[in-house]
A protein has these predicted regions:
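N-terminal alpha-helical "arm" segments
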Residues: 1-43, 337-350
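Assembly/oligomerization interface modules of large self-assembling protein complexes
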Residues: 33-102
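Extended, non-catalytic scaffold segments that flank or surround catalytic motifs
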Residues: 43, 53, 152-161, 168
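Phosphate/anion-contacting hairpin/loop surfaces
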Residues: 51, 171, 175, 305, ...
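Long, contiguous amphipathic alpha-helices that act as assembly "spine/axial" helices in icosahedral shell
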Residues: 81-160, 177, 181-208, 324-331
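A surface/extracellular/periplasmic glyco- and lipid-processing/surface-interacting theme
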Residues: 165-180
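Ordered core of a single globular domain
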Residues: 179-239, 243
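Sequence/fold signature of self-assembling virion shell proteins
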Residues: 217-350
Length: 350
């Protein structure tokens, strides 16, 4: 028929992508807001780090003094491939789908359309969870380990703002100076990374040590001076707002999101917190780091030619035989890039 629509055509698949709601994630959506897609498999970035030089005083008859330009460093990254897929077999489409009314009378074609939406949602959710994990790793460790089938490498962003407290200086220790630590570390980011951090994200244990500290409790209980306010409330995506410190000026959060680690020890996979319990992150609330997507390349069934697409996601489908089945796969090349070097700080505090 002239008006018959193939639900697996590229046009229809693109519409499915637009209609499927995204999984919102705190780190990716808050800190990596400069989203860019590239037509190449590699992403090149010129990094320019400024300084605090001031213009010189000169005599009117001597003339000006040259202010030499700063150099730059070009970093080249190759976004890794993420390529989950699912299989639709004919026998699945002849029977009722989960949640379908017993007497709905849905045709196999209608079931195929519904299952396509469900499959894409599953693939997209898995890909988005991986993007969030990558974004957190880039901030917490300054690296992204790319470990999978046939790949084992590490992308290193050169983070140097890493602190570790030892012995009695740890939060909860007899010589702990939590407020002094935060003041020194916010200054360090301002001086070395040229960024005003206004946010602290604490791991579970770090948060407990912070609020159990006698000096912190005394400061927050000072009725003569407004040095902070504790007003916890839950926010979307597993984030909880704890309150605000006035000196240093920081909004306090905990992020309770977890991930399923089945690659470190495949024989004993476990669920882990994205933010380690004993760590804190000091960061600006609007750093506008880059979320880069490399080009997606695949063979088009109709022409048999390689096709390159400049997009964050490619959803495609193809048929295999013996047994007959339709494959639905998603391809993406995401890479969160914290392109402002040392504009945040991470610390192991307990």
């Amino acid at each position: 028929m002239a008006n018959e629509v193939n639900i697996y055509s590229p046009r229809y698949l693109a519409e499915v992508v637009r209609q499927t709601p995204a999984v919102h994630t705190y780190f990716r959506d808050t800190f990596f807001t400069n989203v860019k897609t590239f037509a190449t498999e590699r992403v090149d970035i010129d990094l320019v780090k400024g300084d605090r030089r001031m213009a010189a005083f000169v005599h009117p008859r001597v003339g000006g003094k040259v202010l030499k330009a700063n150099g730059y460093q070009t970093e080249s990254y190759k976004p890794p491939l993420i390529n989950p897929y699912d299989v639709t077999t004919a026998d699945q489409l002849m029977t009722r789908l989960p949640g379908e009314d017993l007497y709905s009378g849905m045709t196999p074609a209608q079931r195929a359309a519904q299952k396509l939406m469900e499959e894409y949602a599953t693939l997209n959710d898995a890909t988005t969870r991986r993007e969030e994990w990558m974004a957190v790793q880039a901030i917490v460790t300054g690296t992204i380990p790319i470990v999978g089938e046939g790949v084992n490498e590490t992308i290193n962003f050169g983070l140097t703002n890493k602190k570790t407290l030892n012995g009695d200086n740890k939060w909860g220790g007899t010589k702990a100076d939590i407020l002094g630590n935060l003041g020194d570390w916010t200054d360090a980011v301002l001086h070395g990374g040229f960024a005003n951090v206004d946010t602290i994200i604490m791991g579970k244990t770090a948060k407990a040590k912070f609020f159990a500290d006698a000096n912190v409790q005394k400061m927050l209980d000072n009725r003569r001076m407004n040095l902070g306010e504790i007003a916890p409330r839950d926010l979307p995506n597993g984030v909880k707002y704890l309150g605000h410190l006035n000196d240093p000026s920081l909004d306090m959060y905990v992020y309770g999101e977890v991930y399923y680690d089945d690659w470190t020890n495949p024989d004993a996979p476990e669920t882990k917190p994205l933010i380690p319990d004993n760590m804190i992150i000091l960061i600006s609330s609007r750093p506008n780091y880059m979320m880069a997507y490399g080009a997606c390349t695949y063979i088009e069934d109709a022409s048999g030619l390689w096709v390159t697409s400049q997009t964050s996601r490619v959803l495609r489908s193809y048929v295999e035989h013996h047994p007959d089945r339709r494959m639905v796969e998603l391809q993406a090349h995401p890479l969160p890039i914290p392109d402002k070097v040392d504009s945040w700080l991470v610390a192991t505090v307990c």
